[in-house]
């Protein structure tokens, strides 16, 4: 009898335990702090601007008519307490590295082990893996060379003509350009490459994505040589009526060797796994 009673009590305690003793601890509610930092530097036409972005956050770069570089950074931090947010704010930010014809905007933060070892040796370890991001907006002289290294987040580039090199980890990237020498590589996401004018001032562009989609928007009457290729799986969809075969194999679902109008600047679009859409866009 005692054995049966003991077993019954154990069973009751077992099923009642979730109400008396919670099986999981409540999640710690993180505080959020947002701040905006804006900096301006004098800068002549024809120089180089480098941005090393945050692991997460958007990047927008616009060309303008001033001899200045303007950097606006919207910084979002998360931490358990205000004191923790103060610690994070001291490291998750950006610094300038400048010389006569080159300005670098360098993101610092908990993602950079070398930086943390060098400048924040006593930083609390519990804060190292907390989420944070920086959304950058840069305005640069229109004739500027660019080097952009982005992480996870949208990228927009417009109104700049120069030598431009862009890399991103995961991004919806929008490039609206009328000239320059462009190289863009994205690991995963979507790249939309738009040319709003019929002529391109410069030698062309090389656009690559490992997995995802490349959209190519060409205006009516555009002139240029267009190549596209799918390396593994996927296809090329061409709905732009102005393309003609330039050399073998011509225009297929896997490879395109084509010419628009009178030809000229050279554009290459490469997808590892995904789709290349060549289509009619707006423009003048």
Which residues make up each language-model segment?
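Intrinsically disordered, low-complexity terminal regions
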Residues: 2-284
């Amino acid at each position: 009898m005692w054995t049966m009673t003991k077993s019954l009590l154990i069973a009751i305690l077992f099923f009642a335990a979730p109400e008396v003793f919670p099986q999981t601890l409540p999640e710690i509610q993180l505080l959020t702090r947002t701040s905006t930092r804006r900096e301006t530097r004098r800068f002549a036409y024809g120089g180089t601007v480098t941005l090393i972005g945050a692991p997460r956050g958007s990047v927008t770069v616009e060309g303008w008519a001033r001899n200045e570089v303007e950097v606006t950074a919207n910084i979002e931090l998360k931490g358990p307490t205000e004191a923790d947010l103060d610690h994070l704010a001291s490291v998750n930010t950006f610094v300038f590295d400048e010389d006569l014809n080159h300005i670098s905007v360098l993101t610092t933060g908990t993602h950079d082990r070398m930086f943390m070892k060098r400048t924040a040796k006593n930083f609390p370890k519990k804060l190292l893996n907390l989420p944070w991001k920086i959304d950058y907006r840069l305005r640069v002289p229109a004739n500027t060379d660019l080097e952009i290294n982005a992480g996870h987040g949208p990228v927009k580039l417009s109104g700049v003509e120069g030598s431009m090199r862009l890399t991103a980890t995961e991004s919806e990237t929008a490039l609206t350009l009328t000239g320059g020498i462009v190289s863009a590589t994205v690991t995963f996401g979507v790249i939309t490459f738009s040319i709003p004018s019929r002529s391109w001032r410069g030698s062309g562009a090389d656009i690559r994505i490992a997995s995802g989609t490349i959209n190519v928007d060409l205006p009516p009457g555009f002139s240029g040589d267009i190549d596209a290729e799918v390396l593994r799986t996927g296809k090329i969809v061409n709905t732009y009526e102005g393309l003609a075969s330039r050399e073998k194999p011509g225009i297929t679902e896997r490879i395109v060797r084509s010419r628009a109008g009178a030809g000229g600047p050279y554009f290459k679009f490469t997808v590892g796994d995904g789709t290349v859409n060549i289509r009619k866009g707006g423009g003048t």
